[in-house]
Amino acid sequence: MLEFDDIQHLVLTRVPAITGRYEFLSFRQPSQGRAWLAGIIDKVASAQAVRDGVDSERRWVSVAFTWPGLRALGVDEASLATFPEEFRQGMAARSQVLGDTGVNHPDRWIGGLARPDLHAIAILFARNAQERQRVTGEHAAYLARTPGVDVLSTLDLDAIPPFDYAQIGRVHV
């Protein structure tokens, strides 16, 4: 049986977000990455929380990690070895298999997303532009108080009419 309160909402639900931002992060030291995670984990919405409060919530936070990001957090080698080879290789190394060639080659990815020091993505979704500004501002203030976590790049997202939700899919890193 699935424990919906232990699964991030992004895996199982779609929120009524019409805007958002992906913030691509790098950790200088394991302790700094863990400190960032410890401070944001309570803001990450579970699938159960979204099911219970989707109508009243205005914004949603998720996090995703790359395999190098898990290593950068200090996850032990035995645990890292349990992940599928495809995840360990990463998207840039698998670009041929994924069809990311030519103009879509990792060397052309905007924001340096093929960099080996891409460790995590903070996924900040909001119901409207005002809430996006609020959630991104809060995360920026949090990052300013959390040394050793660098923003490599960001990607702002907005709904495309006539849809009433942002075309924000799952993040695969």
Where are the predicted features?
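Long, low-complexity, Ser/Thr/Gly/Pro-rich intrinsically disordered segments that act as flexible linkers
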Residues: 1-170
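Calmodulin-binding IQ motif helices
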Residues: 173
